[in-house]
């Protein structure tokens, strides 16, 4: 990808071949420092990127890197001092930037990828917005998993009732409110049909939290610290949307960030990869910047949601989240994916699939509207991935170039 701060804070993805001015190096504090031996290039890149006004990426194979047995190119664990130096370089970087962190550690089982635990200065309330229509077993699984597993200290759940018919649904609402009187409420949207954007915009009016979490009713929490992992990024002024790693019930990837332009609009990176997979160059293991996140589980500060005008209600079902993330980026914020917040997503159970002519017509209309609105950006490509990948695929397959 192009320069992405969170990627660099997770691993030295820039690696070796870099050109910069002597003036920039002097301004950044001079050449490589041998006290960071083994990760001296990483430490230098962190200092240079703190100072540089513009960083350019050339997306072409300009050189080949040798790999010999016992070298860090083949296995960094062969030289553990490199890992220690990388952690020290990151801690020094955060100190210079005035960023408070609780810990920096090697992600277990990875060849030099780092996890930063940012200090959560103020654990502000998270308002969890869940649109729902019948399918009460899915909702019960979702809500019960939140209360049973979540360790974050301050959250509220706002169930956005959307034209349910089953009496059991309303009995369940009453029971849930009785069990959680302090932080669960039900609000009723009076519109007809299904409009995910309108439902969330309506629910947001009742939110008392500093943060909004858009969450599908067909999800289930896996990791207890999921909200801490998301809030530690959403609290940062530079960050807009934060997305989680979502798994299908068969433990394959449903969402690990959205690639912009895939299939003509957008697609889920690493979709259907095994949950245990490292992904392309380890990208399923570490926090990284992405163009967009799915709104099936998306955290954002409420002030940013209001700043960009919420979800666009002309996108009733598809691409409302991608359109929202594009507008958040246009407002100057960075969107992030973290693999350390994990949930199951039993996708589209309550709404159904695009399986009839009416739904297909609506879907095509949303595709055309999105392409008309963001055509220039789609043509420019996704800086969070690489133009050498096949834009029709979500699995990081290389583009096949025609023979000249």
Q: What feature does the model see in each segment?
A:
Residues 1-23, 35-37, 195-198, 261-303, ...:
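A recurrent flexible, glycine/aromatic-enriched loop bordering the glycosyltransferase active site
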Residues 4-91, 300, 310-315:
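Conserved nucleotide-sugar donor-binding catalytic segment
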Residues 144-154:
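Short, acidic, metal-binding catalytic loop of nucleotide-sugar glycosyltransferases
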Residues 36, 46-65, 88-107, 116, ...:
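Catalytic donor-sugar/metal-binding loop of nucleotide-sugar-dependent glycosyltransferases
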Residues 189-207:
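Glycine-rich, basic loop-to-helix element that forms the pyrophosphate-binding segment
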Residues 19, 79-126, 250, 262-289, ...:
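C-terminal, non-catalytic tails of nucleotide-sugar-dependent glycosyltransferases
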Residues 1, 219-265:
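Conserved donor NDP-sugar-binding/catalytic core segment of glycosyltransferases
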Residues 212:
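Short aromatic/hydrophobic "clamp" motif used to bind/position activated sugar donors
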């Amino acid at each position: 990808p192009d320069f992405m701060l969170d990627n660099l804070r997770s691993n030295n993805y820039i690696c070796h071949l870099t050109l910069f001015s002597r003036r920039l190096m002097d301004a950044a504090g001079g050449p490589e420092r041998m006290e960071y031996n083994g990760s001296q290039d990483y430490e230098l890149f962190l200092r240079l990127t703190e100072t540089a006004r513009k960083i350019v990426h050339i997306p072409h194979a300009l050189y080949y890197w040798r790999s010999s047995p016992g070298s860090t190119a083949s296995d960094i664990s062969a030289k553990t001092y490199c890992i220690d130096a990388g952690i020290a370089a990151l801690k020094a970087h955060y100190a210079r930037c005035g960023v408070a962190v609780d810990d920096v550690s090697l992600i277990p089982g990875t060849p030099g990828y780092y996890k930063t635990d940012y200090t959560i200065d103020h654990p502000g309330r998270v308002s969890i917005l869940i649109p729902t229509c019948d399918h009460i077993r899915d909702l019960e699984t979702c809500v019960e998993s939140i209360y049973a597993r979540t360790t974050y200290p301050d959250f509220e759940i706002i169930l956005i009732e959307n034209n349910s018919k089953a009496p059991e649904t309303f009995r369940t609402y009453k029971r849930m409110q009785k069990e959680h009187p302090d932080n669960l409420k039900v609000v009723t949207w009076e519109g007809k049909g299904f409009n995910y954007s309108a439902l969330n915009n309506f629910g947001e009016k009742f939110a008392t939290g500093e943060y909004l979490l858009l969450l599908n009713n067909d999800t289930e929490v896996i990791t207890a610290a999921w909200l801490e992992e998301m809030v530690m990024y959403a609290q940062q002024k530079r960050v807009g949307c934060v997305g989680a790693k979502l798994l299908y019930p068969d433990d394959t990837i449903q969402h690990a960030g959205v690639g912009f332009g895939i299939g003509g609009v957008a697609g889920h990176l690493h979709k259907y990869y095994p949950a245990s997979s490292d992904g392309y160059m380890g990208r399923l293991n570490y926090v990284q910047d992405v163009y967009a996140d799915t709104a099936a589980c998306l955290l954002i500060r409420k002030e940013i949601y209001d700043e960009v005008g919420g979800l666009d209600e002309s996108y009733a079902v598809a691409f409302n989240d991608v359109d929202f993330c594009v507008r958040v980026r246009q407002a100057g914020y960075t969107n992030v994916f973290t693999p350390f917040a994990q949930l199951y997503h039993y996708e589209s159970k309550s709404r159904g699939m695009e399986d009839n002519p009416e739904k297909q017509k609506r879907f095509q209309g949303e595709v055309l509207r999105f392409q008309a609105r963001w055509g220039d950006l789609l043509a420019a490509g996704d800086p969070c991935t690489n133009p050498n990948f096949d834009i029709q695929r979500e699995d990081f397959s290389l583009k096949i170039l025609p023979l000249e």
